[in-house]
Amino acid sequence: MYPILQFAQTICNDNLELKNFCQFNASGTNKNLEPTTTPASSLVSETAFKGSEETLPIIEAIKKNVCKANWRQTYSTSEVGEDFVNRHCYFELIGPTGHFYNDAIRGFICYWGENLHYKWHSHEAEEIYYILGGKALFKTKTMTKVLKANETQFHKSWESHAMETLEEPLLAFILWRGNGLEKLAQIDD
């Protein structure tokens, strides 16, 4: 998992929006989490993500380390449906319950399959999405825009937002900061 952590550090140092969002510190203690799988985790290594020059190194590191990650699900089938559960997964790279401990931020690697609707949801922690590969339509109550590799989207605390992947899967690096760091997102609709 160290290669992913190092590439995440580089991305946070090089991208102004991420750098301004938080101080990413790759020196957290390795918690040696047990690898776990979800129905979608094998799809990550099988997908040819459309990345950018900046994101291709971390994409390759993630794909090479799929079997070492502690993949998780946030929602139940009753909340988001079976298709979503089967085609979405994430692991916490850095944070209170991540592969590398940090109590000031959380950093997730998240995957969504193509043509997938991520319902309106919110959380107390502030958040910034950084797209590694693929593209998706992001929505808040005041904006709608398509993001692709090397682009970001910020969400304020408790700002309800939704996302739809398009004709290709999405891989994203997501950072959280502030209050509510220990909690997960909740479905709003």
Regions found by a protein language model. Name each.
Residues 101-102, 118-123, 164:
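Short histidine-centered beta-strand/loop micro-motifs
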Residues 87-89, 106-108, 127:
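A generic structural signal for short beta-strands and their flanking turns/coil linkers
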